[in-house]
Amino acid sequence: MARLFTPSESKYYLMALDAGTGSIRAVIFDLEGNQIAVGQAEWRHLAVPDVPGSMEFDLNKNWQLACECMRQALHNAGIAPEYIAAVSACSMREGIVLYNNEGAPIWACANVDARAAREVSELKELHNNTFENEVYRATGQTLALSAIPRLLWLAHHRSDIYRQASTITMISDWLAYMLSGELAVDPSNAGTTGLLDLTTRDWKPALLDMAGLRADILSPVKETGTLLGVVSSQAAELCGLKAGTPVVVGGGDVQLGCLGLGVVRPAQTAVLGGTFWQQVVNLAAPVTDPEMNVRVNPHVIPGMVQAESISFFTGLTMRWFRDAFCAEEKLIAERLGIDTYTLLEEMASRVPPGSWGVMPIFSDRMRFKTWYHAAPSFINLSIDPDKCNKATLFRALEENAAIVSACNLQQIADFSNIHPSSLVFAGGGSKGKLWSQILADVSGLPVNIPVVKEATALGCAIAAGVGAGIFSSMAETGERLVRWERTHTPDPEKHELYQDSRDKWQAVYQDQLGLVDHGLTTSLWKAPGL
């Protein structure tokens, strides 16, 4: 590829659009991976009256917000638009956008849309109850979060939209389309539709045929880091970028986050600690779990896939605990000029490993085929205030998050035979030094903490740089730009103690699931169709 710019031209920058579940960000980086400026706005998804579980994506409003963020980032950086060498977009996975035959976006839903529960159940019965298994073996996805039941819901309930639909993309692709007018999907994000073959990294239209759905709506597939087009004059007026700026194919947020962390080689492993915690392991070739407990997604690195297990609401649970029970600590932390979590970790560091036997019941390990959780609770509390207090419960939550991660990584090892020698811990959770050490002690693995902990936008910027000809390789650039802050080494004695805690927690959790099964308690979350 001919180079449009060279890294020595230090005036040039890269822009990443990061479309998360709750917000949109435009982030500007220099060519050494340093974040220069950001523009950010929260967005809200639309619940449709009388459609339980619906969460539609507001195309018009959210495009306005994206444009405002791009203008804000440029303003905050104090740079002229002509110095943006390229732009790319990443997004939450599973969210889809439909277009009519004139190219106008006509409908979209967010990743959290769960309206199609009945359709999931119907689809599971196809082919003598083997359809979901066929989907999983080919694509690494089950039906619960895939596009197939959502399309079937539209065919049943919004036939006007279904008949008009000419093309389907992901939300990251929609952003690129709004900038360039070019429609395409990339494997890493489109892989979460349950319609993309893991081996070929291309659509598998036979799955739509099997479901009785149209197979003529599938967009061209282009790899992450491919030049898609350029910013149109119309888009330039709205977003502030210069017309003609290269627009590059982006991808899924987790996979691009791994690129930004340098997790680009087979067997490399990461725990991404945000609202949800993802445990991901790179696999050199497609392989799926015979038990269907783990999802498998295309990596942004061609030919590679990622086994991914998800811990539910881990970061959200910590925020709930802080806001519900720690008003005093929030005030003290504010007076001290520190983060509340830092103060809570200092308190929790004085609690012995094992947290006096307290067992939080929140997220289960991932069971992709039958994915649901027990009712939130704390088990084995005591009425001794010296042993059972806020510090103990906070440490117990951190330990439990690490235990669930270790269980998820073990599930991946069981079918992939990949046993990592270390892991990367990133996201907001990795800011906690105690939490990072607990993860090392529970997993028994050295835990490496990067300087840039929110790496999704950086990975997206790397893709933009490859598409613009600035960087020659995504993998090599990811490895070159990542910098490490610290490493946590596991304590063998604590690891042995946590092994016992893990075994007890798994047994107790199974009993708690039984209470949900008997209708006595309410699940933290259930996948559509269960």
Swiss-Prot record:
Record localization: Cytoplasm
Catalyses which reaction(s): (S)-4,5-dihydroxypentane-2,3-dione + ATP = (2S)-2-hydroxy-3,4-dioxopentyl phosphate + ADP + H(+)
One Pfam family matching this protein: FGGY_C
Predominant location: cytoplasm
Annotated GO CC locations: cytoplasm
Cross-referenced SUPFAM superfamilies: Actin-like ATPase domain
GO biological process: carbohydrate metabolic process; quorum sensing
UniProt KW keywords: Cytoplasm, Kinase, Transferase
Known EC number: 2.7.1.189
Primary role: Catalyzes the phosphorylation of autoinducer-2 (AI-2) to phospho-AI-2, which subsequently inactivates the transcriptional regulator LsrR and leads to the transcription of the lsr operon. Phosphorylates the ring-open form of (S)-4,5-dihydroxypentane-2,3-dione (DPD), which is the precursor to all AI-2 signaling molecules, at the C5 position.
Family, similarity comment: Belongs to the FGGY kinase family.
HAMAP family documented for this protein: LsrK
Protein name: Autoinducer-2 kinase
Origin species: Escherichia coli O139:H28 (strain E24377A / ETEC)
UniProt lineage: Bacteria, Pseudomonadati, Pseudomonadota, Gammaproteobacteria, Enterobacterales
